[in-house]
C-alpha cells in the first residue's frame, strides 16, 4: 500500500500557491490564509520604513567562484523586493526561469544597482574548483573579497558606494515559503533602516 502523495508546487514557484496547495492537502487552509495575511501586514509596515529607498535600485546576486548569477523577480528574494516596492535595475526587472540566471564576466555591469544583496552558496557549485567557502554572511564577505579580483567588479557603482550587502546565500538565493519570505523582509529592514 502506498501512502497518499500530494504535489505541493515546485521550487521557484509562487510561494503562496505552494502554501495553498499544501494547506489544502493538510486541511489547514485557514492557517495558511492567516500566515499570508501576517506576511502582507509585515510587508506593509516594512515598506513604510523603506520609503526613502523607493527611487533606488536593488540587485540580488549569487556569486560562485568568479561568476555571478542574477536572482530575478520570480524567486523568493525577488518577490520580497517587489512586495516591498523596491525597484530592480533594467537587466533584472523581469521574471526568469525559476532559477538564477548566469552573468558572463563581459556583462558584469548587469549585476550593478544602487545596492547589491550579495550571496553565495559556497562549496556547492558543481564542478567549480574555485567555489570554496560557506553560504552564510561570512561566506558572502569572503566571496566579495574574491570578486574584487574579477575585472570590472570594483567599477560597479554599488561597490564604489560601499553598497554591497553580504547576505546568507542559502536564504537569499534559494527557494522556500512563508518562513523564508518573512526572514528576507526582516533582513531588508535590518540592513537598510
Spell out what each predicted region is.
Residues 103-112:
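Short helices/loops that flank or line small-molecule/ion binding pockets
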Residues 64-68, 123-125:
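Short, catalytically relevant binding-site loops at active-site mouths
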Residues 57-63, 91-92, 117-120:
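Short, conserved beta-strand edge motifs with alternating hydrophobic and charged residues
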Residues 53, 114-193:
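Structured C-terminal subdomain patch of bacterial secreted/periplasmic proteins
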Residues 2-66, 163, 170-193:
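Extracytoplasmic substrate-binding proteins
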Residues 70-100:
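Alpha-helical, coiled-coil/dimerization segments enriched in small aliphatic residues
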Residues 1-4, 113-116:
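Proline-aspartate-enriched helix->loop->beta-strand connector
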